[in-house]
UniProtKB/Swiss-Prot annotation:
GO CC annotation terms, alphabetical: nucleus
Name of the gene encoding the protein in the UniProt record: AREA
SUPFAM superfamilies: Glucocorticoid receptor-like (DNA-binding domain)
Polar residues bias spans: 42-59, 262-274, 297-307, 597-606, 632-645, 744-794, 863-875
Keywords, in A-Z order: Activator, DNA-binding, Metal-binding, Nitrate assimilation, Nucleus, Transcription, Transcription regulation, Zinc, Zinc-finger
InterPro entries given in the database record: AreA_GATA, Transcription_factor_GATA, Znf_GATA, Znf_NHR/GATA
The protein's name in its UniProt record: Nitrogen regulatory protein areA
GO molecular function, a single term: zinc ion binding
Gly residues bias (residue ranges): 832-845
Region of interest (Disordered), ranges: 39-61, 146-169, 262-307, 390-416, 587-691, 742-918
Function: Major nitrogen regulatory protein. Positively acting regulatory gene of nitrogen metabolite repression.
Amino acid sequence: MSTSVSIATSSPVLTMNPIITEHDFRFPRRPSAWPGAAIHNAPTQRTXNSNRIPNSRDASASFKEHKTDMATTYSLARQGLGGSALFPFLQNGLADSDRSIDRMQQDDPLATQVWKFFARTKHQLPSQHRMENLTWRMMALNIRRHKEEQQQRQDEADARRKKNMDAGSRAFRLGRPMMQSSPSGIAQLRKSSENNLAQPDAMNLDDFIFSDNSGSPINFASPEGDKMVDDRSGSSMASAIPIKSRKEPSLQNFVPQSVPVQPAHQATQGSEFNYVNRHLRKTSIDDRRTRKRPANFSPQVPAVNSTAAQNDLDLDSELHDYSLDQPNQAGIPQQSNGSNVPFNIDTFMENDSMVNNGNFQQNFSFSPSTSPMIPHGPFSGMYHNSSVPSASMSNNNNNSDFYSPPASAYPSNVSTPHPVPEQEGFYFGSQDARTQRPQGFQQSIGSMLSQQFMYGGSNGNSGSTMFSAPGTASESMSAYSTAPSSFGHIDPSQVFQNEQAVTSPTIQMPQDNMFSFGADSDDEDNNAFADRNVSMQKDMSSSLDESGAMGWDASLPGQFSTQAARFPGGPTRKQVMIGGTTTDFVDNNGDWESNGLERSQSQSFRGGNLRRQHPKLPRNASTPVHFGGQQNGFEQLAQSMQSSPAGDGNGTMSGFSSVAPSRPSSPPMSKQGSTTNLQAAAGNGNDGNAPTTCTNCFTQTTPLWRRNPEGQPLCNACGLFLKLHGVVRPLSLKTDVIKKRNRGSGTNVPVGGSSTRSKKTASTLNSRKNSTLSMSTATANSTKPNSSNPTPRVTTPPATSQPPSSKDVDSPVSGTTSGANTAGSTPNSHFGGPGPSSGAVGGKGVVPIAAAPPKTSPGPGASSMSMQRPATASSKRQRRHSKSIGGDVPVSMDIDSPDSTSSIDGPRPFGSSAGLSSLPGGMSASSFNLNQRPSTLGSATGMISMSGGQTSSLIGSSAGPQEWEWLTMSL
């Protein structure tokens, strides 16, 4: 047994000694393998002894020797294995393990160790030399700063000790008090400032990179405690001014008024500068301290609802400061069960006139002085949107209930607004005043959304009296409650979107606010301070029919909606949609969502800033805008819907009447999608407007009116130049002569007994392409003279006879007309009659717009007027997209689609009436049975200029569906 042990212990040495390279470095080498080992002869001795047979004594000796060898191995492993052989940078790692961290920090700081690490292992790093350089600089700076701080502290301590000793010995010798030799206060102040400058910078790189560095600048930023005591002891007996540290400001200091003022300046109570004699030292202007005492507002608004001291205004000193900026609402407000107003509004006045105006009360917002609980936003959820009787609002029992006069948004300078009450609650989420787009989500009457308080119980009187909701005497309703809710993390503005947006793609009207009833100057206040405007939301849009209250699907036949009737093809495009009365905004910036106080149903089609100059007209919640007195012809949109009340049957067009209908209905449109119904757009004589003028070159003579992107009229030259080149046509290119191309007018076939060749005319009746939305009925081209109403004979080119085709679907046939009364598809052929002849205006002549001596000429190709043939079609040689319209007579705007080349049966409506009261040749519209009412309107009056100078109003009324066709103006 002993032999085996001896062999086992000695055989590894025998196998390892001859060849050193065979050693496995995973295991420690025997001591004899290392050069310079303590025992060199042990292997040879063991080798010689191994030849003889060992006995028990040899076995015990071998165990002893083995124990000695193991001790030597451990000592060598500590020195060699952890040394420079394998890990050179950890050479002193095991040897220094018994040393403390502080000692290691002094001898070998962490920055030095880091530099050593990066310096020795830089061949393994991506940025080798840069890392070594960085760590070297860190180490050098840290060590240098550390040494300088130690030296400075040592020098200061020595100097201080020496100075105290000298001063004490001198005072003892001379018998004088010690304070006489102390430095003055200014000297001490200078010295303290120098000491502060000499202190190290707190920006220690090691702190941010190596957080475990025990030598952080916190240890060196200020002198140590005992040295600070020495400083104080040295200056405690000084006769100088003591420099006291500034006191910590108290946390909350609030003005206990209901006036929203800034918090008062921090009162030092005279303790900071007691060494100064008490006199007024006005060294600076305190902007936070108001000079005047805040006015005693009649309704003192207590920030808290306390029953112990109901009017003690010191209670709201516990509230935090508030901000005028609207805070985000924390979570969804709680839904309460009652339907009463949560606050007794009338608490400080007996007979307040505002109490009975419940509609107005429900829309204002107020902000107490120091209450952060009331957000600076709409109170549509807090004040319930039902018509609250004044009895429930006039309870004077709770003296500390909230009351505030209505906030003032932009007051309407045109008329007193009349907000319309609504029976349903609305919630308008937290909004930025610059983008006022409320989330109009409706809810039932009994469930109003209330705000959340940060304190208080779930009910108004169940929790603490502080911050509980002041309610009515009968029912305490929690407007501010913090009942536990599983939906507290939900933002209602993100969840409850506009509920009509999914089912009904209605036209989103501009944002209506409380005072948004029709002033043209309402938009002037928008751009002043966009983020400071208090635009109060009202719970109901003033556009009753236009706000998309009813969902509709245009594809379903049974869906009733005014929007579906007006726009059968779906929602309109974001451009000037002139159909019915609705002409949405074309603003300069192209943004329809105007954040100011806009109108909803007025919808002025404004271009540029011309609208600023118009006179103000009074409006209320139900009347649409009246366009009287506007200076730009294109801003005269449809004053009323085209299906006006039947009282217009006497011949008075509702567009020219002084009374605009309050709830107009809208006609169905053609499927081509109406662009605009600019009724009387190019100039209304009764309204005192000038003829259509180009906004660029100011001409009134052009073969075709165009529009710029803002919707303002341009002549053909300016509009075409803008379209082709993208820039405004310079005025240097303006010429007074319109060059005409000599184009043939086709075969001349006598129409109505007229066989003479038609010529170009300059009359306002046959003006080609007058796209300023004139009515342009070609009734003046009738070729039958009349004794009572003589007109010159006008011959027209042939109009190819063509039966009504399937293209009649673009404008349905009026039910009151017979098949014999057909007319062309362009405005020059609106009216058909049983007269013996018809003046068909055809050809491709280019004529000026302005009035000129009448000449016989063919009108544009598509304008054929048939009054005696059963099916009269317009000429096929018409020019698409540029249909002629007679004169400066803007009455209705028709869409002439490229497909509508054939005649379309039925009279064309004019204004709100579709009838034809008097035909120019003295012919009465026998099929209409209308009262004839001649008028003497000239060409600039917006009516039809007859060739003989006598005009006749083409106004009437007819039963049955109207036929509508709108003319687009080509750009």
